[in-house]
């Protein structure tokens, strides 16, 4: 089967790109043809189709919205990419002609940078489209279902004007206006309704999309896969620390974690690992009190064997999200390495963790409840091993890449068969 994968980043930016890299390589090894369509940023992975990629809407060195200088020219490019881009359609058409014989398109994260106009191009070429939705971009101007730092669902059913009223995009009136206008235009054009199937990682996400007007029959739950990239080292063993790994950004609730850790003041260390966004790491460091300064650490971004070692040797990992986190991959990666998880009871997270079996849950944004649950975990270290073992068994039984790819290919085949009957 020949599959075109569409994603705005074709380099390791986060969980979506890790998934993209893994699934493309796995399917290629199984004899399928995988073709990327993306944006040409500095550091983009090599590809024979790179000449067909879109030019960046801003600086090629700056892939993230928070780092882009909004000159008048850049604003116009983002307006084009956020609404309906003919440039994207032309580039994709050229790629499809060069890669003659595409069977299906798999769209991941294209929001604001690539334009959903490419869905029209696939339809013009009679190519069915499957789209993976891993956040709330189609329901919320800010993508996070957060307003003033708290969960918000005002726009879910299409009342996007709230995003302008509350300046939900970067607290910026112009940016919010562009985003809200784009959402109304795309809803009017029905672009996302043309998608043949939608893949989501959890029931919570599916329910939110249905609430927002998407077809229940088209929406399929397919959990994120994990694959052990590195064999565990025999010298690794559990050490006296707790770990968070992932994005260091406001919606991840790390200020609540620091609050609880300092009040509990356990004789252990806390490591917060990842890239910082919008200056969040510096804001968090400013919250650390003198008595905890030597026990709360920020090692920066880690990957590969280094990250695997951090996860495998932790007593447990923490996911303190305050937003409706759909199905954080960090939970499954912790399980994969025999590490139980303490996470907030919000979004799709309760679907991932079986309480007292593979981890524990606490009330989001509740420092007091996190103190209680963290204290329980630290006081029951004998049970942590059992939880880690149970999580590892669950992942190895149901969530490896081979199982995920088999279910994904079955969906692709069903979509193609249905499409050819029309």
Feature-to-residue mapping (PLM):
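Conserved acidic donor-binding segment of nucleotide-sugar-dependent glycosyltransferases
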Residues: 355-356, 360-367, 376-381
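N-terminal strand-loop element at the rim of the active site
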Residues: 7-13, 25-86, 95, 99, ...
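Short alpha-helical donor nucleotide-sugar binding micro-motif in glycosyltransferases
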Residues: 301-302, 309-314
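Acidic donor-binding loop of glycosyltransferase active sites
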Residues: 312-326, 339
């Amino acid at each position: 089967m020949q599959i075109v994968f569409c994603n705005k980043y074709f380099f390791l930016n986060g969980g979506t790109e890790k998934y993209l890299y893994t699934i493309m390589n796995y399917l290629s090894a199984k004899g399928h043809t995988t073709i990327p369509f993306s944006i040409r940023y500095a550091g983009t992975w090599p590809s024979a189709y790179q000449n067909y990629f879109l030019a960046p809407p801003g600086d090629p060195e700056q892939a993230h919205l928070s780092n882009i200088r909004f000159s008048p020219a850049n604003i116009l490019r983002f307006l084009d990419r956020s609404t309906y881009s003919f440039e994207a359609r032309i580039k994709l058409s050229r790629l499809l002609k060069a890669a003659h014989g595409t069977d299906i398109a798999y769209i991941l994260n294209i929001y604001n940078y690539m334009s959903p106009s490419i869905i029209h191009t696939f339809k013009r070429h009679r190519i069915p489209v499957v789209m993976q939705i891993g956040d709330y971009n189609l329901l919320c101007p800010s993508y996070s279902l957060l307003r003033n730092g708290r969960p918000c669902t005002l726009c879910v059913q299409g009342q996007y004007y709230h995003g302008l009223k509350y300046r939900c995009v970067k607290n910026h009136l112009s940016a919010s206006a562009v985003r809200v206008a784009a959402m109304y235009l795309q809803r009017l054009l029905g672009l996302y309704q043309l998608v043949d199937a939608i893949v989501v990682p959890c029931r919570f996400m599916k329910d939110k999309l249905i609430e927002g007007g998407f077809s229940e029959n088209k929406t399929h739950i397919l959990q994120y896969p994990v694959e052990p990239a590195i064999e565990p080292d025999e010298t690794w063993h559990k050490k006296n620390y707790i770990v968070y790994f992932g994005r260091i950004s406001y919606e991840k609730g790390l200020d609540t974690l620091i609050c609880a850790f300092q009040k509990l003041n356990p004789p252990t260390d806390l490591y917060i690992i990842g890239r910082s966004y919008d200056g969040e790491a510096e804001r968090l460091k400013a919250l650390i009190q003198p008595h905890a300064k030597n026990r709360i650490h920020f090692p920066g971004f880690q990957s590969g064997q280094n990250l695997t070692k951090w996860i495998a040797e932790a007593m447990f990992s923490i996911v303190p999200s305050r937003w409706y986190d759909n199905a954080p991959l960090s939970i499954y990666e912790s399980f994969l390495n025999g590490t139980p998880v303490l996470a907030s009871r919000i979004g799709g997270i309760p679907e991932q963790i079986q309480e007292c079996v593979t981890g524990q849950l606490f009330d989001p944004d509740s420092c007091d409840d996190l103190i209680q649950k963290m204290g329980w975990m630290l006081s029951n270290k004998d049970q942590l091993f059992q939880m880690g073992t149970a999580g590892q068994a669950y992942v190895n039984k149901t969530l490896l890449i081979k199982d995920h790819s088999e279910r994904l290919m079955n969906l692709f085949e069903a979509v193609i068969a249905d499409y050819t009957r029309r």
